[in-house]
Amino acid sequence: MLPNTVEIRQSISREAIVGHETAWCISDLGAVQFRHAYDPQLLETIRRKALELKSERATRKHLDLTFITGADRFIPEIKELINDKRRLDALSSFAGVRLEPYPLSTVGSTVTFMSPSDGAVDWHCDGVPVTELIPLEISDPIIGGELEIYLGDCEVGRAKVNQRLPLPQRNILRIPHSMGYSTLGHFLGIFHRTAPIQFGNRITLVLNLRSAEKPFIDDNRLFYLAADTDQDAEWVMEMTKDVWENQLPAYRKFEAARTGVLAPAVQMPAITSPLPTVDVRTSW
């Protein structure tokens, strides 16, 4: 899937982006763009099917982005890439830790559509720990559409954007996308966006991953996921199950190794569906 000698176009560490060490991370991976060797016919099939599904499945609800959530549910060919061991091994070598596919059905893969009419993606930090961006189509010419990464603490950048203040140009790293090149980013806690596209378009396959050893390092909050997928609630139960079966045991194992205190066994509660009714407090 990926050759032994990979052409790396651009690489930057997490510490170089943020400006200091961070504890809430899976490794010091920041971002790396490399030439991939994914089957071009497979990618073309995914692109074609995504375009056929766009009017029915793509939404534009959050971060000014038009995309198909959980795209592998509708385009089974995506699963070939998600589960390819050679791909996972290669990406893990970039990250410095063993990676696994992100488990939630609505979040594991997306196909994004970016253009002047479809939007791009606004400034944000990722909820998922690691993301691979694989361009399926880039118009020629295209004006805009670069990955822009804020160099500095994400809270500083977010505060400026929330106050409608411009980010200093010296603090923005721009990485253009190219066909045949994939970008792997550990964008959890890293402020970034896609530069608005003024002319042309880009279609991108987005495959999300996490640390196999530390699946609890994750910033996806319920409200944030719901901002994209408020049309169903199945993913809420998936997330709950993953917490008890994967994240909590891994976290207790990590804490036991850190503190030397034996971790208690995880007691899996009964998880029922549908979701219970919650009374919202109206006075304080």
Kindly label every feature range from the protein language model.
Residues 2-24:
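Mitochondrial intermembrane space
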Residues 26, 32-107, 275-278, 282-284:
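Signature of the catalytic double-stranded beta-helix
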Residues 34, 130-132, 203-205:
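Hydrophobic residues positioned within well-ordered beta-strands of beta-sheet architectures
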Residues 37-38, 136-140, 210-213:
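Short loop segments at secondary-structure junctions
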Residues 53-54, 118, 190-195:
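Soluble, non-transmembrane catalytic domains of enzymes that act on hydrophobic metabolites at membranes
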Residues 84-88, 129, 187, 199-202:
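A structural signal for well-ordered alpha-helical scaffolds and beta->alpha junctions
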Residues 112-179, 188:
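Catalytic core of non-heme Fe(II) oxygenases with the double-stranded beta-helix
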Residues 154-284:
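Conserved double-stranded beta-helix
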